[in-house]
């Protein structure tokens, strides 16, 4: 497989910069990822994220009718808690914040830390864990999130766009 990479150490930031330069009216770069360029206040915000390397996930999912922000870690590695916090803070619209990710140890830890910090600041932040990979474990709470991320986040985002409150959106997700 041929790869076009300037420097593997800078891959996520360069990929985000390229995406933002291609869609400057739709995306805005922030530390750790991207958020929508246009803000819709007083709606539940959805931030998605995880390791980079499987594009268009996750930055390519940001836009109207989908996510409000995306946290982009290194290639196949979880983003840091500070990256998750920064993207979530920038994506917050004042009606609660949902953070969606697959069931990977680093993501659970780092997105969970970001949510705790946001809650300590008075933001109603909740984590949405996708556990669709039936091949990875028999117990659904131990399954990873793989292909199911896309449809699960899309349905969740549609509920956010409709203006539903955070409890309704979480119920739809579950």
Name what the model sees in each region.
Residues 54, 58-94:
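Glycine-rich oxoanion-binding loops at beta->alpha junctions
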Residues 70-75, 119-142:
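Short, acidic/small-residue loops that bind anionic groups at enzyme active sites
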Residues 1-46:
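N-terminal amphipathic/basic leader segments beginning at the initiator methionine
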Residues 55-58, 82-85, 106-112, 135-138:
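Short glycine/serine/threonine-rich phosphate/pyrophosphate-binding segments
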Residues 32-64, 71:
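Glycine-rich, flexible N-terminal cofactor/catalytic loop recognition
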């Amino acid at each position: 497989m041929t790869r076009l990479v300037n420097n593997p150490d800078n891959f996520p930031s360069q990929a985000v910069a390229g995406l933002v330069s291609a869609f400057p009216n739709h995306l805005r770069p922030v530390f750790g990822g991207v958020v929508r360029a246009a803000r819709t206040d007083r709606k539940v915000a959805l931030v998605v994220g995880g390791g980079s390397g499987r594009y268009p996930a996750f930055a390519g999912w940001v836009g109207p009718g989908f996510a409000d922000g995306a946290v982009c870690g290194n290639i196949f590695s979880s983003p840091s808690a500070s990256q998750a916090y920064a993207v979530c803070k920038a994506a917050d619209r004042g009606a609660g914040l949902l953070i969606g990710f697959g069931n990977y140890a680093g993501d659970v830890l780092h997105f969970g830390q970001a949510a705790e910090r946001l809650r300590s600041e008075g933001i109603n932040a909740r984590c949405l864990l996708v556990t669709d990979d039936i091949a990875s474990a028999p117990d659904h709470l131990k399954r990873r999130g793989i292909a199911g991320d896309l449809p699960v986040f899309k349905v969740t985002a549609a509920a956010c766009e409709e203006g539903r409150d955070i409890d309704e959106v979480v119920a739809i997700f579950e």
